[in-house]
Curated annotation (Swiss-Prot):
Organism: Pyrenophora tritici-repentis (strain Pt-1C-BFP)
Pfam families documented for this protein: ADK (PF00406), ADK_lid (PF05191)
Gene3D superfamilies in the record: P-loop containing nucleotide triphosphate hydrolases
Residues given in the record as AMP binding sites: 73, 78, 99-101, 128-131, 135, 203, 214
Catalytic EC class: transferase
Keyword Ion transport: no
Record protein name field: Adenylate kinase
Disulphide connectivity of cysteines: none
Record's catalysed reaction(s): AMP + ATP = 2 ADP
Entry's free-text remark on domains: Consists of three domains, a large central CORE domain and two small peripheral domains, NMPbind and LID, which undergo movements during catalysis. The LID domain closes over the site of phosphoryl transfer upon ATP binding. Assembling and dissambling the active center during each catalytic cycle provides an effective means to prevent ATP hydrolysis.
Annotated compartments: Cytoplasm, Cytosol; Mitochondrion intermembrane space
Length: 276
């Protein structure tokens, strides 16, 4: 095999140098405060966790980092009904009759949102769906057909007893879903949303007795779904009993594949003898 010309080696070294600079830029963006991700990065994930685990706190941060859409399926369903879309009208008929909205309607609502919501171009955070293995399978089928498979299924885990103390002090901004806590994460001004200045509310079902029933239902539903995503290899747990900043750092570690990228880069450079 003929040796490479000096000019070819120099060109290759320059390419490698540019690659290393690009990797360093990406690492810098992902480190520290977890600023906005590079334009080539996207996120496609499910954010799981019992009520009060912190989904309403972390989802907006993920959305901001990736410029993605946050699809809280309960809010999305209510919006479709209010807008009287075809899917919304169909769902309203079912709910008015006391029935449960079918998996097909929910998956189609998500599909419609992904196709028409410009915020979803850089990815999505699904919150509140799927709740069953059947729903997970149908969601995966739809996403596979649109060539947008899930990358992460992150579960925020926390002790039920701690949740009770958390939720009984929870405050919510109805329009955005942003959540606060009277003690652990208070708004800057009492009972006022930090972003809009609009009033916060305390949900009527945020009481200990109701919460215990909701938690029992959540655990019964979620265990099989967690097992499903464990098998696919995309499930990751996070200790949600930590303060919100630490939970965010744990999320960044999941999103950050810089160690793998850097490792592969270094290995390649060593193999071709261009890294001293």
């Amino acid at each position: 095999m003929a040796p490479m010309a000096d000019s070819s080696v120099d060109d290759l070294k320059n390419d490698v140098k540019r690659l290393e600079q690009r990797i360093a830029e990406l690492e810098s963006r992902l480190a520290g405060h977890g600023g906005v991700a590079a334009a080539t990065e996207s996120v496609r994930m499910i954010l799981m966790g019992p009520p009060g685990a912190g989904k309403g706190t972390q989802a907006p941060r993920i959305k901001e980092k990736f410029c993605a859409c946050h699809l809280a399926t309960g809010d999305m369903l209510r919006a479709q009904v209010a807008a009287k879309t075809p899917l919304g009208r169909e769902a309203k008929k079912i709910m008015d009759a006391g029935g449960l909205v079918s998996d097909e309607i929910m998956v189609n609502m998500i599909k419609t949102e992904l196709e028409n919501n410009q915020e979803c171009a850089r990815g999505f955070i699904l919150d509140g769906f799927p709740r069953t293995v059947t729903q997970a399978e149908k969601l995966d089928g739809m996403l596979a057909a649109t060539k947008k498979p899930l990358q992460h299924a992150v579960e925020l885990q926390i002790d039920d007893g701690l949740l009770v103390s958390r939720i009984t002090g929870r405050l919510v901004h109805p329009a955005s879903g942003r959540s606060y806590h009277k003690i652990f994460n208070p708004p800057k001004a009492p009972m006022t949303d930090d972003v809009t200045g609009e009033p916060l509310i305390q949900r009527s079902d945020d009481n200990a007795e109701t919460l215990k029933k909701r938690l029992s239902t959540y655990h019964a539903q979620t265990a099989p779904v967690v097992a499903y995503y464990q098998k696919t290899g995309i499930w990751k747990p996070i200790d949600a009993s930590q303060e919100p900043g630490q939970v965010w750092k744990s999320l960044l570690k999941i999103f950050d594949d810089k160690a793998m990228v850097a490792g592969r880069s270094g290995s390649l450079l060593n193999k071709i003898g261009l890294k001293n």
